[in-house]
Amino acid sequence: MTKTFSAKAADVVHEWFVIDATDKVLGRVASEVALRLRGKHKAIYTPHVDTGDFIVIINAAQLRVTGAKSTDKIYYSHSGYPGGISSVNFRDMQAKFPGRALEKAVKGMLPKGPLGYAMIKKLKVYGGAEHPHTAQQPKVLEL
């Protein structure tokens, strides 16, 4: 009788990939990145083990959204004080913090809890074309 394979955390090899987000649609990039951060693209995927890879995203400032979402997509945050809600649309967020919209989109697609928090730490987003992870020799991933 064969037994179901269950990956061990010590046996998992985390690879490094780099994605160029120039003129890519936000949601399509985010869904592919979330899938790879979880490790669901691997045959050894195990739900309770972090089997995902490291993802480096460059040129996040050139991400685009479809339709009128650049002005209509609103991100809300609250300070915790009465009347402390603040909102910013996609265009303004990209201008001030390039890549934060992508981080928020991916974070919403990952599981909530200790394992999900460990997965989001493997995502590195940079607004420009330069990144400090060349020593890890990331492979180029085309979407």
UniProtKB/Swiss-Prot annotation:
The role this protein plays is: This protein is one of the early assembly proteins of the 50S ribosomal subunit, although it is not seen to bind rRNA by itself. It is important during the early stages of 50S assembly.
Q: What is this protein called?
A: Large ribosomal subunit protein uL13
Name the NCBIfam families on file. Answer: rplM_bact
Q: Which InterPro entries match?
A: Ribosomal_uL13 (IPR005822), Ribosomal_uL13_bac-type (IPR005823), Ribosomal_uL13_sf (IPR036899)
Q: Which GO terms describe its cellular component?
A: cytosolic large ribosomal subunit
A biological process term (GO) from this entry: negative regulation of translation
Q: How does it assemble?
A: Part of the 50S ribosomal subunit.
Q: GO molecular function: any one?
A: mRNA binding
Instruction: Report the superkingdom from the record.
Output: Bacteria
Give UniProt keywords alphabetically.
Ribonucleoprotein, Ribosomal protein
Q: Name the source organism.
A: Albidiferax ferrireducens (strain ATCC BAA-621 / DSM 15236 / T118)
Similarity comment text for this entry: Belongs to the universal ribosomal protein uL13 family.
